[in-house]
Amino acid sequence: MSTPPLAPTGMASGPFGGPQAQQAAREVNTATLCRIGQETVQDIVYRTMEIFQLLRNMQLPNGVTYHTGTYQDRLTKLQDHLRQLSILFRKLRLVYDKCNENCGGMDPIPVEQLIPYVDEDGSKNDDRAGPPRFASEERREIVEVNKKLKQKNQQLKQIMDQLRNLIWDINAMLAMRN
């Protein structure tokens, strides 16, 4: 799944781009393309916000006290931003087309098949029925052990009460003797 090299932002391909750099640029996977696309979208949003900021601050030259030099500067900035915005959209389109080309062989799975339904009959539910049964058996065993523990605790409490009563009786007889 190798793709043709994309020129990274701010880097010019010149005499310093050796064969190792070209090889690394050719091996761009789909995840890297998606990251580049995300960064491009962020740049587009940033440029668009700057364009709206310029348009908001820019007044039309209708004879109102407005300097033509300032107007020309802002107009130049606006045209530059629009030119860069069109370049970014072309770059985004290239990234989008390349991602679709790389993922073209994959068959998309409909979302409805990815969502498990309770009343769905099939082998998928049979596979999933194993662990809940095991959990219910384990739960039943825990309940039984708890019942046995409560019974043992009750028996120990009765024995302790009997010993307490015996000690009281012994102490009472010793007290009467003296």
UniProtKB/Swiss-Prot annotation:
GO BP, one annotated term: somatic stem cell population maintenance
PTM annotation (N-acetylserine): residues: 2
Main localization (coarse): nucleus
Pfam families in alphabetical order: Med30
GO MF annotation terms: nuclear thyroid hormone receptor binding; transcription coactivator activity; ubiquitin protein ligase activity
InterPro entries linked to this entry: Mediator_Med30_met
Key words, A-Z: Acetylation, Activator, Coiled coil, Nucleus, Transcription, Transcription regulation
GO CC terms of this entry: core mediator complex; mediator complex; nucleoplasm; nucleus; ubiquitin ligase complex
Region feature Disordered, mapped onto this chain: 1-22
Localization in the cell: Nucleus
Coiled-coil regions listed: 134-173
Source species, domain of life: Eukaryota
Function text: Component of the Mediator complex, a coactivator involved in the regulated transcription of nearly all RNA polymerase II-dependent genes. Mediator functions as a bridge to convey information from gene-specific regulatory proteins to the basal RNA polymerase II transcription machinery. Mediator is recruited to promoters by direct interactions with regulatory proteins and serves as a scaffold for the assembly of a functional preinitiation complex with RNA polymerase II and the general transcription factors.
Family: Belongs to the Mediator complex subunit 30 family.
Assembly behavior: Component of the Mediator complex, which is composed of MED1, MED4, MED6, MED7, MED8, MED9, MED10, MED11, MED12, MED13, MED13L, MED14, MED15, MED16, MED17, MED18, MED19, MED20, MED21, MED22, MED23, MED24, MED25, MED26, MED27, MED29, MED30, MED31, CCNC, CDK8 and CDC2L6/CDK11. The MED12, MED13, CCNC and CDK8 subunits form a distinct module termed the CDK8 module. Mediator containing the CDK8 module is less active than Mediator lacking this module in supporting transcriptional activation.
Identification of the protein by name: Mediator of RNA polymerase II transcription subunit 30
Taxonomic lineage: Eukaryota, Metazoa, Chordata, Craniata, Vertebrata
